[in-house]
Amino acid sequence: MQRAVVELGATADALEAADVRLLYVGSFGGMEQGLVARESNLPFQAITAAAVRGRNPFQLVKNSVLIARGIREARALIRRERPAAILGTGGYVCFPLFVAARQLRVPTMIYLPDIVPGLAVKVLARIATQVACSFEPSLSYLPRGKTIVTGYPVRSELFTVDRVASRATFGLTDEAPVLFVYGGSRGARRINRAIETLLPDVLRIAQIIHVCGREGDETWLRAAADRLPVELQARYHLFPYLHGTMTQAFGAADLVVARAGASTLAELPAAKLPAVLVPLAGVHQDENADYLVAHGAAIKVADHAMLGSDEPTDGPLFQEVRRLLIDTRMREEMAQRSAALAKPDADGRIADALLDLAARSGAPV
């Protein structure tokens, strides 16, 4: 959900520049409201939402009742707010909202951040007025007649972040390259465990910024760091979460180890960074990672095989990280290939498409 708030926040800036009034619609009891307040300051309204599917017949009936209620609430909300157009990213709240919008003839756009759409986006793409996607390979999964490629909107500061100032933010030096490890706002425990195991070996050749997430991993990672020699401890910069300085972490880095979420596919090119990606299984991250790998901007390591069976350092995670940290020329070539994939005008493309959609519908913008 944070990803949706941030990506729509970038688009919101472009829409607000066009003097458009914005409203974020989320679900009751969800985490959206707090994130919206913190990340974008957009006004927020909630409606009832539930999964289109259910784990069993009882759950399916219950969800159907909740969705019907959500559609009624969405109709009332649309009549009250009179939106010129609606943009969604595929969460549960989008289905009742898009159904109500279609009934009331309000144009809608569904936006696909990842390469491969999930069930929700596939369903919504059929009823949406227009579909937008981040990357060209997604076109094979979506209705071509109404799908456009916009890129993925990211913070504009990523394109111009200053390396020297960014390193100063974290107290980093130029004596060794900087590895940035992160697994999203909630972290990635398997990556964190692998980094814990490899910590002394990596710190001998690099400085590390490690954003471990808010799931309690900081405690045992901090304990592992405290057992290191003092000179290696000074090279390790551990945070559960970065609020306000994530851009500087990208700016300070020479190499990234991360999952392969949609935001990563856009942030790495924006920051001109190569990466070793460890896709999370079962959520289409493999296809996301393959996109950067195919363009020579990243290397993919399987989540289940990061470490060696005998010696952890014999595994592909350490071997690939070590190779890229040591081989400056290869790292810089990958960085250039990564930068070539950037779409700095993605937020403007989505905003323009949404405004055009509203104008063609005859609705007042």
What residues fall within each predicted segment?
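Conserved nucleotide-sugar phosphate-binding/catalytic loop shared by glycosyltransferases and other
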Residues: 12-71, 301-305
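A short, well-ordered alpha-helix in the C-terminal region of glycosyltransferases
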Residues: 323, 330-344
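C-terminal alpha-helical cap of glycosyltransferases
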Residues: 323, 343-365
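Active-site-proximal region of nucleotide-activated glycan assembly enzymes
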Residues: 15, 42-43, 102-164, 169
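Donor-nucleotide binding loops and adjacent catalytic segments primarily
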Residues: 16-17, 35-37, 163-168, 172-255, ...
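A donor-sugar binding/catalytic signature common to diverse glycosyltransferases
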Residues: 87-89, 246-286
